[in-house]
């Protein structure tokens, strides 16, 4: 008798954050439970969901929000929830490691096991998104995690703009890519709206690597007081799930709380990926220029 194909149901959550950790974690748990009720096996919560996106301003006091990875209370709570529901949950958090700080995600398997840590590699620095003040560049490299339901790759927000990150995870066998995110308006330019660009870039990653992709973003207006006045970002949501050709299979708007769900046949996608030939026809020997910042070392 032929084995059944491997089906996986993924979910992206979207909600507005308050500046109260317990309230936000409770909201995340409520939506994880809602996603589970819809049949989800792997559930993505947005980036740094424990509070406001504090990186709008450079304030020493915000370092107090960081906590060590071992025994982190929100991770422990999500471990218990994952075990109870039998779901996989990537958990984004502000990590303190001695005198270093990282924008990190812990991957919790369906039995509550912590499978390991990814630290954000690409750290942005611009008006409203001053992450270099808070976070060291990640040192884990791009990784994949074998969960109960699928081998997954997880990267964080600004990482999603770099095709090299998606390809690195896909080359290691990632069957689904996940990107927790916090992105919205640009404080220095009211006319700049990146939401469509943001979505299309990741749809391209899905299509180029022939893997589904899940992106979860927050919504709502957040105001941070600074010494120069208030900084304000309206987060645009637009969370989505893309299929293996980059097609949009589920999408949220820019204001509403959402639980997006989609099912994929991993074995069918694997056959499509192999048949399409993009991994067969790769030429790593010609890509050494990618190891330089300015393209000055092309293959001769």
UniProtKB/Swiss-Prot annotation:
Catalytic activity: N-carbamoylputrescine + H2O + 2 H(+) = putrescine + NH4(+) + CO2
CDD domains reported in the protein's UniProt record: CPA
Biological processes per GO annotation: putrescine biosynthetic process from arginine
Superkingdom field: Eukaryota
Domain CN hydrolase: 8-266
Active site: 47 (proton acceptor), 120 (proton donor), 157 (nucleophile)
Pathway: Amine and polyamine biosynthesis; putrescine biosynthesis via agmatine pathway; putrescine from N-carbamoylputrescine (amidase route): step 1/1
InterPro entries, alphabetized: Aliph_Amidase/BUP, C-N_Hydrolase, C-N_Hydrolase_sf, N-carbamoylputrescine_amidase
Pfam families per the UniProt record, alphabetical: CN_hydrolase (PF00795)
GO-annotated molecular function: N-carbamoylputrescine amidase activity
Record-listed E.C. numbers: 3.5.1.53
Gene3D superfamilies, sorted: Carbon-nitrogen hydrolase
Family annotation (NCBIfam families): agmatine_aguB
Quaternary structure and interacting proteins, as annotated: Homooctamer.
Family the entry assigns: Belongs to the carbon-nitrogen hydrolase superfamily.
Protein purpose: Involved in polyamine biosynthesis.
PANTHER family, sorted: BETA-UREIDOPROPIONASE, NITRILASE C965.09-RELATED
Name by which UniProt lists this protein: N-carbamoylputrescine amidase
Organism: Solanum lycopersicum (Tomato)
Lineage: Eukaryota, Viridiplantae, Streptophyta, Embryophyta, Tracheophyta
